[in-house]
Structures are given as structure tokens and as C-alpha cells.
Amino acid sequence: MTRFEFFDHTADIGIIAYGRSLEEAFESAALAVFEVMTDTSKIEYKVEVEIEEIGSDLENLLYRWIESLLVYYDSDLLLFGKFKVSIDLNNMTLKGKAYGEKFNPEKHERRTVVKAMTYHEMLISQNDGTYILRFVVDI
């Protein structure tokens, strides 16, 4: 299964992430965001970051998850290439781990910096056992 794909969007980047579970789709979404910024296959898992979020709904939970990861890039230049997520739908909470390392210009390709997550065109759906997350990030 393809984990994610990009779609054209004026001045920003659209992402469609897939997963066999909601958690896997959230992990794919995070991977796609960091793939916009660098080649994630070059990221070593030297640092582990734990993230806990509470959302008002699934869209808000996705927004908070991606935005939290971007804060680590903005503040510490951390790039992530592996993620583990668990979601409690009853309490609308997310517990996640992100694995990666600090950006190194000699090792990591510098692509487009993602400035922020948005709600623009956000859609979370399920089709034939596949969860689909569609959203746009600001670049």
C-alpha cells in the first residue's frame, strides 16, 4: 500500500496519507510532511520524542499532531522519519512517538520547509478498510 501521495495546490502542498488503521494513516501523514522537507530514508533514529495531544475531533487531532512535530523542527531542527501513534477515540487523545535526528546539511537534502499545518481541504475518511487523510500544509 502506498503510504502517501502529494496533490497540486496553489502556493502550498497537498498531502493524501493512507493507512490500514487510523493510527497508521496518522503515521503516514507525518512521514509525508517530513518527506516534503527532506529525503526521510536518510534520517537515522537517534532521538525519540513523545507527543500527547487532545483534540476536539479527529481533524483537530490530526492538526495538533502535525503541528507538534513541526514545532520540534522549528525549535530544534529535528527531522523525523519513523512514527508510532495510538489514538483513543473515546477521549479523542493521541499518544505518539517520533524518531529522528537533528538536521545536518551535509547529510540531509534541503527541500521545501513546511511552515504550518492547515485545515484547508482537510478530510478524514475510510474506504474499503483504508483510512485516508487529506490535508494541505503551508510552505
UniProtKB/Swiss-Prot annotation:
The superkingdom of the source organism is Archaea
Q: Which GO terms describe its molecular function?
A: calcium ion binding
User: Which biological process annotations from GO are given for this protein?
Assistant: tRNA splicing, via endonucleolytic cleavage and ligation
Pfam families (UniProt xref): Archease
In which residues is Ca(2+) bound?
D12, D138, I139
Keyword line: Calcium, Metal-binding, tRNA processing
Task: Show the NCBIfam families listed in the entry.
Answer: PRK00407.1
The record's comment on protein family reads: Belongs to the archease family.
Q: What does this protein do?
A: Activates the tRNA-splicing ligase complex by facilitating the enzymatic turnover of catalytic subunit RtcB. Acts by promoting the guanylylation of RtcB, a key intermediate step in tRNA ligation. Can also alter the NTP specificity of RtcB such that ATP, dGTP or ITP is used efficiently.
Protein name, entry field: Protein archease
- What organism is listed for this UniProt entry? Sulfolobus acidocaldarius (strain ATCC 33909 / DSM 639 / JCM 8929 / NBRC 15157 / NCIMB 11770)
Where is the organism placed in the taxonomic lineage, from the top? Answer: Archaea, Thermoproteota, Thermoprotei, Sulfolobales, Sulfolobaceae
